[in-house]
Amino acid sequence: RRQRQMCIRDSYINVYVILNETTSWGKAGHTIAEEQFIIQTPATAAHASKSSGTITLAADKNWLRITADNFETVFNTDEARMILLRYHNSDIIYGHEGLTYNGYRYISNNKRDWKPTAFKVKDFSYQLAEDHSYVKVITKMEATIDNITVPYCVNYTIYANGTIDVDATFTTNDHFNLPRLALQMSLCQRLEQVEWYGRGPIENYWDRKDAAFLGIYSKTVSEMGENYGRPQSMGNRCDTRWLEMKDKAGSGIRFSGDVPFEFSALHYTDKDLFFARYGHDLGNFHRAETILNINAIQNGLGNASCGPGPLPQYLIQKNKEYNLKFRMEPIR
């Protein structure tokens, strides 16, 4: 197994039952059954980035620019959002669409009205370390979909070497009834190569993941989708230890977490998939950029296309705080 920096060292055994002779119903080598047994998932602790170099800040009433050697990021202070991330003069973020809340997921064939998300900035502040080795950026927001409001915070610790630790908190209340608590961002077109250590290679969800074994997998973003009779939110991967979004030369950005996370990487937003009526309509909605979602939690799928929903243990709970932590760092 390849070893990667910050990779959680899991131990597991894959067991396969395979035909050793051809029968009337299957050829030799056909897999009858398979199972993965998790032997060890050790607890890990976050490690601060050992960063050399110093950070320079420049601020205006509408933006905050953070620069260091071969690294630059910019925040729109009115929106409390990262709008630029650049490593070695190569952009990562597309269209100023940095991390922001996403609570939507469309997996129903029943047509409903689209409900846009309204954002309200509650606070934006920053603090530079005395030695200029890192800066903390603190944002507090509210996201409202229809009559449901979700307070959330996204805090960034940004180091001079380009490493960014993200710490997000989402709070639900009595009225909460959304399928997902996630951060979404748009990545530049060149970052088409996806590699991850987590469950795969097929899509998988909280209550539907046993058939997707833990392992290291790679696909293109275009290969991360599914062919459903009616387009819908798709392509989720659970229990992810690290995720790399790269160009053909192997440069890009790496996401990793001490606690495994879920992600999806598609050429469509949830809104695109909502309005695409049939599979052949997807070409009209295809985007050159990649829409990346990293989930704190999302509801399970359940087993009924209509009727009962997911079991209670696979639902986001009301009046609860959910946390999402991960690290972003450059790949060269």
Descriptions of predicted regions:
Residues 1-2, 95:
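Contiguous N-terminal and early-domain "leader" segments and peripheral loops that mark the onset or edge
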Residues 3-8:
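Short, small-residue-biased leader/transition segments that mark boundaries at the very start
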Residues 9-47:
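Terminal connector regions
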Residues 37-332:
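Beta-strand/loop-rich accessory regions of lumenal/periplasmic or secreted enzymes
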